[in-house]
Each structure stands twice: as structure tokens, then as C-alpha cells.
Amino acid sequence: MTELSRARYAELFGPTTGDRIRLADTDLLIEITEDRSGGPGLAGDEAVFGGGKVLRESMGQGRATRAEGAPDTVITGVVVVDHWGIIKADVGIRDGRIVALGKAGNPDTMSGVHPDLVVGPSTEIIAGNGKILTAGGIDCHVHFICPQIMDEALGGGITTMIGGGTGPAEGSKATTVTPGSWHTARMLEALDGWPMNIALLGKGNTVSSESMWEQLRGGVSGFKLHEDWGSTPAAIDACLTVADAAGVQVALHSDTLNEAGFVEDTLAAIAGRAIHAYHTEGAGGGHAPDIITVAAHANVLPSSTNPTRPHTVNTLDEHLDMLMVCHHLSPKIPEDLAFAESRIRPSTIAAEDLLHDLGAISMIGSDSQAMGRIGEVVLRTWQTAHVMKRRRGFLAGDNGADNQRVQRYVAKYTICPAVAHGLEAEIGSVEVGKLADLVLWDPAFFGVRPHAVIKGGMIAWAAMGDANASIPTPQPVLPRPMFGAAPKAAAATSVHFVAPHALEDGLADRLDLSRRLVPVANVRSRGKSDMPRNDAQPRIEVDPDTFTVRIDGDVWEEQPAAELPMAQRYFLF
């Protein structure tokens, strides 16, 4: 019997059980814990496409028709990185959903073929060998300021956006709110043809319950409370009362100036109810200087945004001007300047790094064009993980590879926001039954630029060379829209998430939309313990005079990074 060395096997079929892979140019390594597509015990008839290879008629390709259950697409021999594990598998897609992770091929000629991965004449093949597959990213903090953010997001591995806005209006530039049923209807129509799942947030800054119910019937998926509209205790309580009755989530950007109360007053108004705390961080806004302490509470689902990810020597310098623009402030007004400066605290920005590494801050979003960069959600997440690896070493349970840390960080922009907003039945992980919103990465470019973005089973975005070239690879190779980004295909492979009451009220009949409307579900019972790998509740204290942060009694010292991976080695600008 012919034997292959591990190195030769990896060259032919991709790495297998026990092999380790470096993520981009970071210090992070992953180790494959299981190979369902081949490797030890299954080597010899891996599903590989190409001239002289396995997936040919009467060899790896069988006779099964689509009507008999053949998958529409199989991604072969790919390393799946998800919150639940790091394995290698062939991944099957049918009707836009994941149907199996196992071994693909022809059971007439091959052993161990998964019954839902029988390759037939109707099956397309995407070669995942030597590549990494993650769930499509979920940006849980989006300002819909301009439509071009869709291109940037897709090019960064994002397939779902949660947020609000109506365009470059001052309210939208500041507050991630789509206010009122008219604006909501127009935005749902405008976003119908993009290869992106959408969950709009309505305005929760009101004590008028009817105005909130009106927005729910109009198609929002939940509410946003923002200090620029007045995040008072009364508004918080009123919004959460409606949210509890409607079964939707509330995202909160609290009161930086402490005008209507302090962080303790906001927590009292929340009264133990589930809430997504935006900007649980060092510079994004919310009660100064101690909004970060809410990450210790069991009912609070905390997120932070990417402009402070990770803490570097340049973080503070860029924030003041960004803040003045985003929140319609004037440097000529002393009070505006003081407001801005109160939000930018190096000690709490530094603590944000550690709280992410502990799993105490559960999610990362962009805050797109409102201090954050929508194309860098995934990239900034992995830069943070790298910085923490360098400073803190391996996490408990890791030894020689960083599987625990990697599974924690990938959850921050996939399953955790899906759970927080009631979307996890449809998206958020690489699991059977979910939409095939998937991102394929070359390991050398992991987190930097995807090899391909698959939306609802169809390639929507990909690294592609000159279209007039004789082959697909000649330079310039750029992230480009593919056929899955065409409006009708995009609508067929994407969804709008809405409140259940919108469907009960006949929204689908009132609006001429091409895509499915899907109700959010199982939201109000969620808590920190439901955040996979990100459920820590350490004791957090902030000194009101020095802003020193103590986590479980220990001071976390500022050590801003002077150099990062995934940066100038990959980008000219």
C-alpha cells in the first residue's frame, strides 16, 4: 500500500486531523480535530474535482438526480472554523441551505459517503481543499448611510447587517435608527436586491407605545435607544416593555453625559430584562466613564465596535475628530468639545481588549461610517485576538494551537449576534439547516480578504482577476460582485428579518418585495449565558477620577500595540 507523508497529503487534499494552520500573519494557530472527508482512516478516495481526479462520471460522481436528493453544491475538503469546533469536511448545500458536513462522493464506488452528500450530475463543486470556511459575518451595529457599504461589507466577509438609517441624514449618521413605517418600507424596498440579510432597528426613544407598535408593524426587527434622541430611564423602560410584549431586541447607546442618570439608573430602568448594550467599550459612547461595567451583568448582551479594536498607539489620535463629525458637534463650542473628550479614555479602551479575550464582551460590530469601518469587522476581531495572544499567551485548554481563542473570537461576529437578535434559526453558524451564508478564506489571507462569499448557496462576491484575461487569475485580482449579487438572485438568497407582528399584520402583502420576510424569534429570554464562548461575567470597576479599570480586582495596565498583523503587509493604504 502506498503511503503519503503529511506534507504530501496536505498538498494533494489539504491539511487533515492534527495539522495546524496559521491564520494570516498573526500568531494564531488552529488545529484540525476531526476529518470527516478523508485523512486517517478515510484516506484514498477523497472527493476532489479536476482533470484525472475523483469527481468524474461513474467514479466520484454517481447517478443520483436532484429529485433523488443530490446536493446543488459541495465544498470539498474545507476546514470549518466555527464556535462549535474546528474540523475538516465536505460541506453540502441544497436549496440555499447547509444539508451536511461529512464525506461527499458516490456510494457505488466509495465507502463512508454521507447520504446527503451523494454527488450527482446536478451537483456543482467548489474546491475548499487547503482553505478555511466560516459562517457569514453578522455586523450588529450598522448605520445605513450610503448603499456603498454593502460592497465594503461583502468584501470583508459580512452577509448580515443589523442597524438602521435612511441615508446621509443627520439622524442616520449618528444613531442607527430607521424611524417610522414610511422610512422602514422604503428601506426594505431599497435593500431588496442586495445579497445581504437585513434587520432594521426602529426608534425606541419614546414613551409612546403606539408609535413603537406602529414601527413593528412596519417591518423593523427591534429597536434602538440612542442618547442623541434621549436615552432616559423612562424611554428605556417604555421601549423594553413593548419589546417584551412583541418579542424583539433592544439595542442601547446610553447617556454619555449622565444627564438623566448614571449607569446604575440605566440598569435600574432595564430592571433585569434582556438588552443588547452597544458601545460597552472605551470610546464609543454611553455613561462616562463606567459604561464598560455593564458587561458584568447576566441580562446584558454587550458588544463593542471596531474603531477601538485593538488598542494601538494611534487609537486616541483619530477618535476626537471622528466623534465630532459623527455626532454633529462643533469644536467651537466648549461643551461639545468636553462631551467628545469625556468619551475617549485610554484605560477603558485597553480594558476592552481584555474583556473580549475573557469572553465578557460578547460581540463586535462596525459602527459603519459613524466612527467604525464596515469592511474591517472581521479583520479587527482577529487583530484583537492576536494582540491578546501576544500579551496573555494561550487560553486555558489551548496548548500548541489556539482553538479555544479562535472559537471564542469567531463567535463574536457570527453566532453571538444571531442569538442576541433572534436570528440563529436561520444564520450564525456552519450547521445543518441554516442558510448557506458562508465565507471561504485562503489561510494566508484569513480575515483580510475572502476568497469567496457564498450567499444563500450562491457565490455573491469573490476575488477575481481581469475579466478579459484567458483564465480567472491574472492581476488585478480584486473583490468583485458575482452572479449571486445580481438583484433577483440576491433577493432569492437573502432575507429581511422583521418583528413577528409585521407578518401577522400583512406586511408581506403590503410591500412588493422579492425576498422572504423572516420573523425574529426567541429573543426576550436570552441572557449572557446564551452567548456561546462569550458568557463571562467578571467584576468590573472603574475609578471615577483616574478611570483606572479593575477586572476581578486586578488593574489592567495600558499597553497599546505599536504594530499589528493583517495591516501593511496586505494593504497599500
Swiss-Prot record:
GO BP: urea catabolic process
Biological or metabolic pathway of the protein: Nitrogen metabolism; urea degradation; CO(2) and NH(3) from urea (urease route): step 1/1
Binding site for Ni(2+) 1: 141, 143, 224, 367
EC numbers: 3.5.1.5
Secretion signal span: none
Keywords: Cytoplasm, Hydrolase, Metal-binding, Nickel
Residues that hold Ni(2+) 2 according to the record: 224, 253, 279
Principal location class: cytoplasm
Cofactor: record remark: Binds 2 nickel ions per subunit.
CDD domains recorded: Urease_alpha (cd00375)
Active site: 327
Taxonomic superkingdom: Bacteria
Requisite cofactors: Ni cation
InterPro entries in UniProt: Amidohydro-rel, Metal-dep_hydrolase_composite, Metal_Hydrolase, Urease_alpha_N_dom, Urease_alpha_subunit, Urease_AS, Urease_asu, Urease_asu_c
Keyword Metal-binding: yes
UniProt xrefs under Gene3D superfamilies: Metal-dependent hydrolases, Urease, subunit C, domain 1
UniProt-annotated location(s): Cytoplasm
Catalytic activity: urea + 2 H2O + H(+) = hydrogencarbonate + 2 NH4(+)
Quaternary organization: Heterotrimer of UreA (gamma), UreB (beta) and UreC (alpha) subunits. Three heterotrimers associate to form the active enzyme.
Family: Belongs to the metallo-dependent hydrolases superfamily. Urease alpha subunit family.
Protein name: Urease subunit alpha
